[in-house]
């Protein structure tokens, strides 16, 4: 078996990536979320494939087809709720994964980090289009509001919106193309994840101390493969608990009503994992300014390698940066909460202050903290 593992062209690739891969001996559970994301992606592709066999991307029958899946298809309700809650689970793991990268300075592997940002954008686009497919009330109005933001682009905005809609409003053509893109994007994400892994294995994994670990490596299997397996079991237990006992906890009640273009909901809300960017969008009264802030709220992650001023890689031994990091996490939780609230006082001013702090923390406070910590170390 060992000879085949190390000589067969296909097995050799798997061996180098998952078996004999040299890994730092001190990486913690925070390095586990990459493999959990892989598990989530496999679950999403598998359940999505079965759902697509029964779903119809037509405005007249989309809502009924989702109802049919839940009522008439064997275990259709389970597949539907696994897919819906699997998206939330995917983003929970994704945000933990990004948070670990920021805290421990993994963003200094620039190629791996930038591909990760592309994966985040593709994941958010896939999640948004999936949110539209059940053709509930919030699906329709969410699609209308978000796609209409492109009209803020000078000169070509209005034409772009009509081009995406396939007409003069969100209708059958929009739903059909959203279904097509929602089906193909997870496979592209899987391909990009392989490229992400390829670049990661060029440099090797970072570790909590942020130091070179070439002299102290251990094989990935069986040390970390079993460690990952334990957390996969824990993830699946949590996943099935949500799916069986609280299937609608992370959804919107308005989506249990079929889409009605003549009845606008009092408050248009996206899925929880998009709410922090949505809150930043709403905090700026100008339409173009808000769209710029929305895009920049994600792309600002690409500036982390350029704004790294500390002589140390991670924030393990940097108390000022640690404090700012946890303030940033608190700020993101506040933005997520604000994104789910109506646009009225006091939520408007809270959202604006949280948005200002988000950008100022990343662009000003964290780099300044790194410089201060460098000075303190020389005393």
From Swiss-Prot:
Query: By what name is this protein known?
Result: Cytochrome b
Q: Which cofactor does it need?
A: heme b
Q: What does this protein do?
A: Component of the ubiquinol-cytochrome c reductase complex (complex III or cytochrome b-c1 complex) that is part of the mitochondrial respiratory chain. The b-c1 complex mediates electron transfer from ubiquinol to cytochrome c. Contributes to the generation of a proton gradient across the mitochondrial membrane that is then used for ATP synthesis.
Could you state one GO cellular component term attached to this entry? respiratory chain complex III
Q: Which UniProt keywords apply?
A: Electron transport, Heme, Iron, Membrane, Metal-binding, Mitochondrion, Mitochondrion inner membrane, Respiratory chain, Transmembrane, Transmembrane helix, Transport, Ubiquinone
UniProt binding sites for heme b b566: 97, 196
Indicate which residues the UniProt annotation says bind a ubiquinone: 201
Taxonomy, top ranks, is: Eukaryota, Metazoa, Chordata, Craniata, Vertebrata
Q: Which InterPro entries match?
A: Cyt_b/b6_C (IPR005798), Cyt_b/b6_C_sf (IPR036150), Cyt_b/b6_N (IPR005797), Cytb/b6-like_sf (IPR027387), Cytochrome_b (IPR030689), Cytochrome_b_C_euk/bac (IPR048260), Cytochrome_b_N_euk/bac (IPR048259), Di-haem_cyt_TM (IPR016174)
UniProt family annotation: Belongs to the cytochrome b family.
> Any additional notes?
Heme 1 (or BL or b562) is low-potential and absorbs at about 562 nm, and heme 2 (or BH or b566) is high-potential and absorbs at about 566 nm.
């Amino acid at each position: 078996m060992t000879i085949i593992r190390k000589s067969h062209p296909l097995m050799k690739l798997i061996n180098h990536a998952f078996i004999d891969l040299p890994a730092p001996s001190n990486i913690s559970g925070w390095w586990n979320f990459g493999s959990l994301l892989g598990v989530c992606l496999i679950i999403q592709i598998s359940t999505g494939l079965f759902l697509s066999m029964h779903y119809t991307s037509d405005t007249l029958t989309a809502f009924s087809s989702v109802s049919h899946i839940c009522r008439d298809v064997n275990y259709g309700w389970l597949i539907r709720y696994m897919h819906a809650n699997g998206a939330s689970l995917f983003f929970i793991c994704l945000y933990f994964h990004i948070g670990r990268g920021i805290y421990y300075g993994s963003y200094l592997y620039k190629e791996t980090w930038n591909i990760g940002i592309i994966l985040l954008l593709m994941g958010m686009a896939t999640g948004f289009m999936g949110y539209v497919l059940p053709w509930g009330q919030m699906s329709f109005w969410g699609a209308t509001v978000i796609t209409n933001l492109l009209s803020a682009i000078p000169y070509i905005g209005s034409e772009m919106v009509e081009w995406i809609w396939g007409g003069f409003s969100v209708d059958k053509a929009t739903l059909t193309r959203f279904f097509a893109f929602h089906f193909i994007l997870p496979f592209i994400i899987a391909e990009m994840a392989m490229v992400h892994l390829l670049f990661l294995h060029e440099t090797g994994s970072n570790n909590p101390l942020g130091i070179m670990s070439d002299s102290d490596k251990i094989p990935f299997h069986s040390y970390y493969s079993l460690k990952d397996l334990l957390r996969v079991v824990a993830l699946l237990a949590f996943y099935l608990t949500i799916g069986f006992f609280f299937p609608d906890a992370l959804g919107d009640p308005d989506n249990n009503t079929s889409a009605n273009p003549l009845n606008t909901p009092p408050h248009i809300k996206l899925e929880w994992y998009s709410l922090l960017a949505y809150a930043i969008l709403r905090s700026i009264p100008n339409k173009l300014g808000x769209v710029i802030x929305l895009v920049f709220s994600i792309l600002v992650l690409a500036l982390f390698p350029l704004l790294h001023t500390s002589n140390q890689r991670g924030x393990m031994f940097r108390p000022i940066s640690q404090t700012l990091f946890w303030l940033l996490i608190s700020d993101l939780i506040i933005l997520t909460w604000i994104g789910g609230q109506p646009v009225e006082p006091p939520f408007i001013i809270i959202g604006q202050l949280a948005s200002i702090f988000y950008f100022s923390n990343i662009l000003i406070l964290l780099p300044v903290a790194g410089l201060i910590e460098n000075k303190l170390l020389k005393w």
